[in-house]
């Protein structure tokens, strides 16, 4: 990992936070933490909420670099990245294409499957396919239980674990309120883990794996961010060879999507044979007090402030 430069060399930095997605509140929490860390380190950092200001104001106000702490749509999906490309302001995290693909779990799966990477079997239901007959047939394809979720949302928003045929229509309707397409996914029974990545290409580095132990109620939006009921184990307690295999798969998944800067992959380890399955890649992960990238980085010897500086140092443009 390269040495962190003089914080003053970053110039005037905008921490993009808030935005208009369903994850706005979490973004404000992430951005607030990043902003304080950068300011404490001596960076000339300022909060910037795209909900309140047009992005062109970044150029007018003389910002030289952006730390993207936005989550979800219009922040993590390539749109803001594209605007910053046009404004020629370097930004943290993945570029336009990788951000757009990773935001869409169906497109992400297609890339991973083409690369021979393990991900649960799935069925995509386009709006014209969400008929009662087709919806009732999905469990015949994937088995029960199964997961129904919006392909372009995060933080477990709109997700249902379907246990029986009678739940399918309501689960699809809930998901469709957040995204016209619906992703139905094979349920992997086992341990949930997550693994962050820092860097780009051959220099990308997988950080320690975190094992997630949810309460009986499940790992939902409320538990993720607003309670202490979920247990996060780092070190993960997994056998060394199993953790190394997860890190290998995550690095391959990160590179396959063309990610850069930083990211975090979520996986399930199937209990029956200990096989890991990729669920999604987050290209602008949370940086709150409950967030997992800072926890993993700390286990690797990188404190929160140093992590923020390292990510900011990697700010770049696609071309």
UniProtKB/Swiss-Prot annotation:
Question: Its domain of life?
Answer: Bacteria
Keyword Transferase annotated: no
Q: What is the protein's name according to its record?
A: D-alanine--D-alanine ligase
Q: HAMAP family recorded for this chain?
A: Dala_Dala_lig
Provide the protein's localization. Cytoplasm
Q: Catalysed reaction per UniProt?
A: 2 D-alanine + ATP = D-alanyl-D-alanine + ADP + phosphate + H(+)
Keyword list (alphabetical) reads: ATP-binding, Cell shape, Cell wall biogenesis/degradation, Cytoplasm, Ligase, Magnesium, Manganese, Metal-binding, Nucleotide-binding, Peptidoglycan synthesis
Q: In which pathway does it act?
A: Cell wall biogenesis; peptidoglycan biosynthesis
Organism field: Methylibium petroleiphilum (strain ATCC BAA-1232 / LMG 22953 / PM1)
Q: What is the lineage of its organism?
A: Bacteria, Pseudomonadati, Pseudomonadota, Betaproteobacteria, Burkholderiales
Per UniProt, where does Mg(2+) 1 bind? Answer: 266, 280
In which broad location class does this protein mainly occur, judging by the first location in its UniProt entry? cytoplasm
Disulphide-bridged cysteine pairs: none
**One biological-process term from Gene Ontology?**
regulation of cell shape
Q: Binding positions for Mg(2+) 2?
A: 280, 282
Gene3D superfamilies, per this entry? 3.40.50.20, ATP-grasp fold, A domain, ATP-grasp fold, B domain
What enzyme class is recorded for this protein? Answer: ligase
């Amino acid at each position: 990992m390269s040495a962190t430069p003089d914080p003053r060399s970053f110039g005037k930095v905008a921490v993009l936070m808030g935005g208009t997605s369903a994850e706005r509140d979490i973004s404000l929490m992430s951005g607030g933490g990043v902003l304080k860390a950068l300011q404490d380190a001596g960076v000339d950092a300022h909060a910037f909420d795209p909900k309140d200001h047009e992005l062109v104001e970044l150029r007018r106000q003389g910002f030289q670099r952006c730390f993207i702490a936005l989550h979800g749509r219009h922040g993590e999906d390539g749109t803001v990245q594209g605007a910053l490309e046009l404004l020629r302001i370097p930004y943290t995290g993945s570029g336009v294409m990788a951000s757009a693909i990773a935001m869409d779990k169906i497109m992400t799966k297609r890339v991973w499957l083409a690369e021979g990477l393990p991900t649960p079997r799935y069925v995509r239901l386009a709006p014209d396919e969400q008929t009662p007959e087709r919806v009732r047939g999905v469990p015949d394809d994937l088995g029960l239980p199964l997961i129904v979720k919006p392909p372009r949302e995060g933080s477990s928003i709109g997700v249902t674990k379907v246990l029986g045929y009678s739940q399918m229509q309501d689960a699809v309707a809930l998901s469709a309120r957040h995204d016209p397409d619906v992703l139905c996914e094979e349920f992997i029974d086992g341990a949930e883990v997550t693994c962050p990545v820092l860097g780009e290409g051959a220099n990308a580095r997988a950080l320690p794996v975190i094992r997630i132990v949810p309460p009986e109620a499940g790992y939902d939006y409320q538990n993720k961010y607003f309670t202490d009921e979920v247990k996060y184990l780092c070190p993960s307690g997994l056998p060394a060879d199993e953790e190394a295999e997860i890190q290998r798969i995550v690095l391959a998944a990160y590179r396959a999507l063309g990610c850069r800067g930083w990211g975090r992959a979520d996986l399930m380890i199937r209990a029956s044979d200990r096989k890991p399955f990729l669920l999604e890649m987050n290209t602008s992960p949370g940086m709150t007090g409950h967030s997992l990238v800072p926890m993993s980085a700390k286990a690797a010897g990188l404190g929160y402030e140093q992590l923020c500086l390292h990510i900011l140092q990697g700010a770049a443009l696609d071309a």
